[in-house]
């Protein structure tokens, strides 16, 4: 048999997490439909595109964290405790971007997760206002994050293989 690569393990974990999140999302949509007998999705293609871009960005971010954790455990703890909270708080899960004053929006629109959440809301209802939100920014962030992580993996694969042999 072919030797299992570290990327195979990371991708298997990612696929399992995506499967779980997709099941929860579809279950929630089915629950909404069964309770209200009304469910509309104005742009299902946009919703699928945003969902896949968010997944690819998360996989890239996870691969980067694996390598950062190999170099310094403190960075991993810092990212898990502090940076994750900042990303979640500024990702528009608790507020809508159009409710913010225009002069405060630049402080949160740097977050690509905010763009993903707002674009997903827009795909459900095309009348939802999305000021300063861009699909191209989400595509750029996903591509750069995944590309950087794959380059990092390719150049430092031996480091992971050495640590697995211990």
Q: Language-model segments: which ranges?
A:
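Junction motif at the cytosolic side of a transmembrane helix
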Residues: 140-166
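Juxtamembrane membrane-interface segments at transmembrane alpha-helix termini
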Residues: 56-65, 93-94, 118-122
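Short hydrophobic, aromatic-rich alpha-helical segments embedded in or entering the lipid bilayer
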Residues: 95-130, 134
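Alpha-helical transmembrane segments and their short interhelical loops
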Residues: 6, 11-78, 133-140, 146-150
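Short helix-to-coil transition segments within interhelical loops
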Residues: 1-5
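Membrane-interfacial segments
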Residues: 35-39, 69-73, 99, 124, ...
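Transmembrane helix segments
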Residues: 69-110
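Hydrophobic alpha-helical elements at and bordering transmembrane segments
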Residues: 9-10, 120, 156
């Amino acid at each position: 048999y072919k030797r299992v690569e570290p990327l195979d393990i990371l991708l298997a974990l990612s696929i399992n997490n995506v499967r779980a999140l997709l099941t929860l999302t579809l279950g929630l949509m089915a629950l909404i439909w069964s309770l209200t007998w009304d469910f509309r999705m104005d742009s299902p293609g946009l919703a699928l595109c945003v969902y896949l871009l968010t997944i690819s960005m998360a996989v890239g971010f996870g691969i980067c964290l694996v390598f950062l954790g190999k170099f310094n455990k403190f960075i991993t703890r810092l990212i898990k405790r502090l940076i994750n909270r900042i990303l979640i708080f500024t990702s528009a899960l608790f507020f809508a971007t159009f409710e913010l004053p225009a002069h405060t929006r630049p402080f949160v629109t740097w977050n690509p997760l905010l763009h993903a959440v707002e674009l997903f809301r827009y795909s459900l209802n095309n009348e939802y206002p999305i000021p300063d939100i861009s699909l191209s920014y989400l595509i750029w962030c996903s591509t750069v994050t995944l590309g950087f992580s794959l380059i990092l993996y390719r150049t430092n694969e031996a480091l992971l293989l050495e640590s697995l042999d211990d």
